[in-house]
Amino acid sequence: MRAPRPLARIARYRAPALAICAAAACAATVGCSGGASPGLDWNDEVVKEIEAWRAKHEADYRRDWATIEGLHFLAPGTHTAGSAANNDVVLTGALPARVGRFTVEDDHVAFDPEPGVVLTVNGNAPTPGATLRDDDADDADEIVANGVSIVVHQTGERLALRVRDPNGKRARGFRGFSWFPISREYRVLGRFIRDQVPHEEHVVNTFGDIDTYQSEGVVQFTLNGQILRLRPFTTRPKHLYIVFNDATSGSETYEAARFLTAELRDDGTTILDFNEAYNPPCAFNPFTTCPIPLRQNQLRARVLAGEKKYPERVEPPASAAR
């Protein structure tokens, strides 16, 4: 059985002991005493950078996440797959009637192409029976036929085929993003409070699967006079990935979560710019899998910054059910 990727249930979450005592926390944290945060720039260039970031973010999502047309789960064994109804797995998108056969054994998926069908794997002729690397890796194997791509996707212990069609229904219907006005008060300086020992967080995602992330501490900051903490995941050295929601979730913003990324400085501080808080792709595409915030990342404060909710509600597909 494949090890789960992203917590034992969020309700059971308990933060590990922090590397500093509570009495010293405020003294060691930027912004506890109020006033302007040192080392935090705000000028026309910062505003332009946020505007440029938002434009690039939407363009990236339009090119990538908006093109996902389907997520098709695979049980152990061998399955025919293609667009025709007589396949074991009927794929969405403008694919051939039969693409080939996918064999699931343990935590691997092997692919045998249908004879005579024109397709490539990573731009080359396919090797029958080759094992496909899933999209958790930077070098995932990509099957392409008729301009439509297929990759293996893992969510928790389950494996699926993820189909992308740049000319498909979802790509054509993508409605773009809307944002709160850029605001200086939502760009704050935080201090990273490191745990005594790094650990893994097992996080429930929107499909009910469990994924695993590395966590090394919390970020403490002051927002609108409130001292708050968020626990980021560490996806690479000094890069903080924060999954949170707040008192606007479900009304002004997407109900499940928003994401925020930040870079950790050598002095232990980081800029949290909530003007760049953004929705996960599951806010507009039901065939994506997204983590749910840890309990301590569910803020009672209202964060009126960053991306607003998508203009139409998107429900997870029936195939998401466990």
Predicted segment positions?
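Bacterial N-terminal signal peptides that target proteins for export
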Residues: R2-C21
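C-terminal motif of bacterial Sec signal peptides marking the signal peptidase cleavage site
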Residues: A28-G31
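Bacterial signal peptide processing site
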Residues: S33-G35
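N-terminal cleavable signal peptides for secretion/export
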Residues: S37-V89
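Forkhead-associated
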Residues: I68, F73-A140, T261
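Surface-exposed beta-loop interaction hotspot
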Residues: V144-D211
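Flexible, glycine-rich surface segments
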Residues: L189-S249, Y254
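Extended, aromatic/histidine-rich regions of cofactor-dependent oxidoreductases associated
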Residues: S249-S251, E263, T269-I271, N275-R322
